[in-house]
A protein has these predicted regions:
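Short proline/glycine- and basic residue-enriched helix-capping loop/turn segments at helix->loop/beta transitions
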Residues: 80
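Glycine-rich hexapeptide-repeat left-handed beta-helix
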Residues: 1-8, 12, 46, 52-54, ...
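A positional/architectural concept
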Residues: 13-67
Length: 193
């Protein structure tokens, strides 16, 4: 897993986080407790900081990039960022789910419990109210979530994190925050048996 220092800032990864050896973290990145980062994700904090809150899962091929000093990325707790999402700068509260292939541009504010549906685009500077389900290019509200929906979102995020705790217990050579490639291959072979 490439962890690259940039302008004197090196990624800060909690020993209780799980980061794939096939992901890349650059610069001022903070990965908090129980975060899971899957293979192929690129997290580049070269111009501004990136903070990933507890129990958040970053799926395969996610791209986070701070293009300017005004494009910091803050992801709340219990969030799920699905495969192929691009984040170019946003403030995201807790219990948010960003579905596959979505692009979020700079200076976006996303409220608690929001879901953004597959292949949507969120234009720069948009504020999305809490518990809203959004879809489209550009995004538009399609419905509201209940408090119960948001609690289910939290449970789903916890389940993803707990899955990696179980996996880590099965891997004798796993480091505190890194699943090595040989251990990852062993795990995949074990599942096929």
């Amino acid at each position: 897993m490439p962890i690259i220092e940039y302008n004197g800032r090196k990624p800060d990864i909690s020993p209780n986080a799980y980061v794939s050896p096939l992901s890349t973290l650059i610069g001022d990145v903070k990965v908090n407790n129980d975060v899971v980062i899957w293979p192929g994700s690129i997290i580049r904090a070269e111009n501004s900081s990136i903070n990933i809150g507890e129990y958040t899962t970053i799926f395969d091929g996610v791209m986070m990039f701070t293009r300017s000093q005004r494009s910091s990325i803050n992801i709340g707790r219990y969030c799920i960022i699905e495969t192929g999402v691009t984040l170019l700068g946003c403030f995201m509260e807790d219990y948010v789910q960003i579905k596959e292939g979505t692009i979020i541009f700079e200076e976006v504010s996303i409220g608690e419990g929001v879901i953004i549906m597959n292949h949507s685009q969120v234009p720069p500077g948009l504020t999305i109210p809490a518990r809203t389900v959004m879809r489209g290019i550009p995004v538009d509200s399609i419905r509201e979530q209940t408090r119960n929906d948001v609690l289910k979102q939290k449970e789903k995020a916890e389940n993803y994190s707990q899955l990696f705790i179980k996996i880590k217990q099965q891997l004798p050579n796993a480091q505190s925050y890194l699943l090595t490639l040989p251990d990852f291959v062993k795990l995949m072979l074990k599942k096929e048996e």
